[in-house]
């Protein structure tokens, strides 16, 4: 269903990814608007006004559409984009009041491109600051317009495996109580959605960064969801218990003095090792991941959160 010729065409090096999304959605009657912010071009789906009810909160759903230079970007992040494009087409003429604001963001991978030739990992560091993300500028606009009470759901790299992974995020103890409560509420909501979509088989794990970091940095509650194969998720959880410092390596690329970096790199899930390489290709994807995502998005569409 998802992994057809359109998907392959989207992966072609010469494809203008922004135009592809606009044209694909337009061909299915879906209206869009391009939002230029800080040199990036984000794409917003313009749902009919009848899609919204003032009685419930807006659910902002995001996936970055840019890819790392030289990588096909099949999982990172064409997988999420294609899932959301299909979802947008289904929602657009559904007639239901879903309260979804859907945005395809640009510039997430720019934070991963270093001046030297070595591809950076998907994690934060001095070389890869959260402020370099395209979504950081978008979150800044949200903050300026006082759009701070939305739920923000980010989908990143959902094309391999059947285990939904909720990115483990940390809220500073000094954070405002309103923000802390908002974050824990959205975390609880997405956990319920993931649990009901996959017979309870979901996990919360440390994950390399995604667009939710830019929103969190602005005090806007946001969660990120990715996917892993069962064997990779189990092995990763086991290694996190055995070697607690693995978490800091995944999130911040920090290596303890008495540990070899190569030792830690071996414990990174195989799916993540494909990021930013030629191995992140069409053949690496699994059809069942997209079936799982369809269930998750359907449950998210019907979720109603009273204002």
Residue ranges, per PLM feature:
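Acidic/histidine-rich catalytic neighborhood of metal-dependent amide-processing enzymes
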Residues: 68-196, 204-208, 212-214
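N-terminal capping segment at the start of a domain
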Residues: 1-16, 22, 66, 266-283
